[in-house]
Amino acid sequence: MAILLFCTAACSDSYLELSPESSVSDEVVFENADAAQYAVNGLGRIMSTQYLDTQGYNGEGTVYAYQGEYPGDVIQKGSYTGWQNLAKGNYFTSSTNSNIHVTWYYYYKLIRNANQILDNYKTGLANVAEQRKWDYVKAQALVYRAYSYTMLSQLYSRRWTDADGLQRGLVLRTTVNNDEMPCSTMAETFELVYRDLDEAISLFTSCGYDRPADVDKRWMANLDVAHAVYSRAALIRNDWQTVITHSQEARRNYSIMTPDEYKAGFNTANQEWIWEVFEDDTQPVHYYSFYNYMSASCLGSASRTYPPCISKQIVDPIDPADKRLAIYAIPTPEEVGDVSKVSGSGKVTKGDFYNRVKKEFAGRIYSTTTIFYYLSTKFIVKSGTGDGCIPIFRAAEMMYNEAEAQFRLGNEQAVRTLLEQTVKPYNADYTCTKSGDNLWEELKAYRKFDLCNEGHSWFDLKRWGDPMVRKTWAEGGSWATYFAEKNTTTGGNYGPADKNAWTAVIPTMETNYNSLVSNVEKIKSDGTWDRN
């Protein structure tokens, strides 16, 4: 397959230097495929841009932090009491909440821009070389649209198993317009996602182009990315054989990172990253960035004062020999002492643990970072202002996706093999001999641990139909009591049917102008959506 030479200039910093969309006509932007590639590259920039004039709203990173991690069971923001409602998932039924708005706004912005590219796609050209370029442009835009609808469905639609696809889906816009439009079903949403990805895969294969091989071009979509999106979409849809097929295809050209790469800060693409959000000091979003909220090394107060901490419940099942544990400040029982005296999320201001972390993690945290038990240093900023790339897909996720699908199909030996392949690079003595429910728990434990901080926790729990279980220090965990109340309405421990079945209502930014959509989902007695 040929490298995508026609976008070499567009892949440099100059691709950011575009006139505002409203000031450039479609005739200019889509004059030819080379020009259209700049518009495609702009989709990548949308994924790392500040939105709604709100600190912390940075595109893809916001979804990972605010939706995937803070409400989950893997990471808590040390003593960040002001974010209790976000951390406990108490905003799902608030159609005016900005955290509900931002994800809808961001992904539909991506969809609209992808649709603009697709609306201007040129076909039937006599110039074969130019047609192949246009086909590559279209394939990339289709991937962005399919990915956006996949991610939206995880938040704004119920679990696939709740109604086998007959629950409410999304507003499926496939062209640039402002027409009123009703919601689809979830099944119709995934029919579009599959159709877009099938066409993208076909075009990627036939056009003969690929993104440059440099790892710093992993922000560009290609055939592997299309397969990765397919894997995640099929996992949400419980389409197990499809998960297996596309997980294997997606990771074919990638290998698990080494222990040293794993500990290097997760801020730069490497051999394992399939797709990324690109950000560096030439185009930072400063205090709005993902790193300002999910690292312990940024100079912003959200990072220094309230660093992320991995839950003790996530660490405990992992073999102590696993080299990935080194990026977390895990205390010994002696360092913790009397748990009844632990403050909140585990803040420490002096003593043996404090001194050890300050010394051992000096290069991984900011000089004035507040120290907590189980402090996470997985993400390390490239510079103090908060810049750094973010993995969207890694080979490891594809292996966990496949393992989950294999388990659902009863292929337990395949699950054990996949687990060993993901763990042995970090613990050479690891073997998996478990079966049945114990194997399922082992798979979930290593998935949670490996993908920690990367935006999966809450989405995984929702898909599995698992309850939110947060144990306080007194209960053998490490959660602050204000994040772990036993209250299914507003607390931090609740079941899969609570809190609107973990489903966000459609925000008023849609319902205020689209009268065909309501932020109240009517459910029939059989669990399906009442479209009337």
Regions found by a protein language model. Name each.
Residues 11-65, 247, 314-320, 329, ...:
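Membrane-proximal, proline-rich intrinsically disordered regions
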Residues 38, 244-395, 440, 450, ...:
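Hydrophobic-face positions in mid-chain alpha helices that act as interaction patches
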